[in-house]
Amino acid sequence: MAAAAAGPASSQRLFQSFSDALIDGDPQAALEELTKALEQNPDDAQYYCQRAYCHILLGKYRDGIADVKKSLELNPNNCTALLRKGICEYHEKDYASALETFAEGQKLDSTDTNFDTWIKRCQEIQNGSESEVSASQRTQSKIKYDWYQTESHVIITLMIKSVQKNDVRVGFSERELSALVKIPAGEDYSLKLRLLHPIIPEQSTFKVLSTKIEIKMKKPEAVRWEKLEGQGDEPTPKQFTADVKNMYPSSSHYTRNWDKLVGEIKEEEKNEKLEGDAALNKLFQQIYSDGSDEVKRAMNKSFMESGGTVLSTNWSDVGKRKVEINPPDDMEWKQY
């Protein structure tokens, strides 16, 4: 009987040795002693709760959560265990779970002001996070990007000005593009795309310019991309053809073939009917453009030596002599 009576007294002394004050003094030593105690008494809810406190002081919040969960399984109405569970969840940045845990503990003990304090902390952080998300969403909506393709590349342009190269991170994988940009205003812009077709990551690059960020993704094959993004099985891609070269889909509802536009402009210039000096100048330009090296040398030499009064294409003539100044009959040449 004497031995039986000594058991509870010994257990009480052991429990007293694990008070919060003693744990504060040396949490690591207390952790080791509590682990030994739990080996002897694996169903002691209070030991788990106190060991969780050791984990909190040592910054091991996940281990703390595991211990308080075990403590609450053995004693669901342990307010201290709920408080410590919420603290661990808070430090693990699981603010929603922490808020729920603190609210549960407050229902059990409304006089403990610790629950009020931690509930307010969670609410402040959650409200702050919502504000940050709203600011980020505003940034995302302001910044636009365009894309176009050539036979060998798909090019994305981010319309972001005055960004330093060190503030830009771009990642390439076979079917994914990610970009993170630190905006001068202090907000971040992120872009993540699941690409329609594969790219060659190691041959893909980006360039930071004063007015934009240009991302060039290398195509493994000269195929035409019908769109930028896509998932799953895609139809057999079409081979890239000249009639779609350098089309800029952009954010507009139409595409423009810039090569075709340049060709049309050149054709208009070629067929433009000029009169007077303009027609004569165009004729000289055409002669010079189509001429041989000797013709070009003759035109340059005659024009320079004559002060612009003679233009000859006969190199065998002007190459042997200095071309004299010869103004038109009704004009007089003067040197200024």
From Swiss-Prot:
It is found in: Cytoplasm; Nucleus. This is Protein SGT1 homolog. May play a role in ubiquitination and subsequent proteasomal degradation of target proteins. The modification Phosphoserine is found at residues 252, 302. The modification N-acetylalanine is found at residue 2. Keywords: Acetylation, Cytoplasm, Isopeptide bond, Nucleus, Phosphoprotein, Repeat, TPR repeat, Ubl conjugation, Ubl conjugation pathway. There is a cross-link at residue 266 (Glycyl lysine isopeptide (Lys-Gly) (interchain with G-Cter in SUMO1)). The modification Phosphothreonine is found at residues 236, 255. Residues 247-336 form the SGS domain. It comes from the Eukaryota. GO terms for molecular function: lncRNA binding; protein-folding chaperone binding. Belongs to the SGT1 family. PANTHER family: PROTEIN SGT1 HOMOLOG. Probably associates with SCF (SKP1-CUL1-F-box protein) complex through interaction with SKP1. Interacts with S100A6. Interacts with HSP90. SUPFAM superfamilies: HSP20-like chaperones, TPR-like. The CS domain mediates interaction with HSP90.
